[in-house]
A protein has these predicted regions:
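Short, charged alpha-helical interaction segments and adjacent helix-coil junctions
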Residues: 1-6, 10, 14, 66-68, ...
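Accessory alpha/beta interaction modules
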Residues: 1-150, 160-162
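C-terminal segments that line or cap access tunnels to active or ligand-binding sites in enzymes
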Residues: 148-151, 156-160, 171-174
């Protein structure tokens, strides 16, 4: 049974999507995860739908943003264990590429892209908070394909000391452990405010 709108948390797909529509939340979220500085966030569309061809499986992306360098970031919230998570990530990244490249375009026009899944479970059972995947040479692990694609799985149930304190606090907040710093407090205030938004309430009810 679906949650009442007033009970939604950041880890709920709908709430995550609406909160991350605001650059003042998605920008520090990405900066904390990737340990980079982003000058500007752009939203090509509020919620990205990609349908390449009739008969092909389309996708709706929770969060699709670009930075000032036109790097693409796709953020997805995943709260249920999914056996097909790796292949789903592969499909999403492929669809993003197909959406970017126009017919006849040079492959150099493909943008660097990150597909990031925030999971409230550990899909690999290794205790890591973050699993980062890039294409590498099996014979020489130091050699990357440098194809501009990165897949990241975040695990809110991580137990290892493998991420920054800021990222640990963020993942703990997503997992429902409460606020512990300025950013998680800002996120909680955004969630409380969103619960009072009548338009979003109606949008949520329409989806149920």
């Amino acid at each position: 049974m679906a949650k009442a709108y007033e009970e939604l948390e950041l880890k709920d797909d709908f709430m995550f999507s609406v909160i991350m529509r605001d650059p003042k939340y998605v920008k520090p979220f990405l900066e904390t995860i990737l340990r980079i500085k982003i000058a500007k966030i752009e939203y090509p569309e509020v919620q990205k739908n990609i349908d390449i061809a009739a008969g092909a499986k389309g996708i709706r992306l929770d969060v699709y943003v670009e930075d000032e360098k036109h790097t693409v970031f796709n953020l997805e919230m995943q709260t249920t264990t999914a056996r097909n998570l790796p292949k789903r990530m592969r499909y999403y990244q492929g669809m993003i590429d197909l959406n970017i490249l126009e017919k006849g375009d040079d492959y150099n026009h493909l943008k660097k892209s990150y597909v990031i899944f925030v999971c409230t479970f550990d899909p690999f059972g290794l205790g890591r908070h973050i699993y980062t995947f890039e294409n590498r040479c099996s014979e020489d692990i130091a050699l990357t394909l440098n194809d501009g694609t990165v897949k990241i799985i975040l695990n809110t149930k991580g137990t290892l000391d493998d991420v920054s304190p800021e990222m640990k606090r963020l993942l703990d907040y997503v997992d429902g452990k409460g606020v512990s710093d300025t950013f998680t407090r800002d996120l909680e205030e955004a969630v409380q405010s969103a619960r009072q938004n009548e338009k979003w309430r109606l949008d949520y009810m329409t989806l149920q």
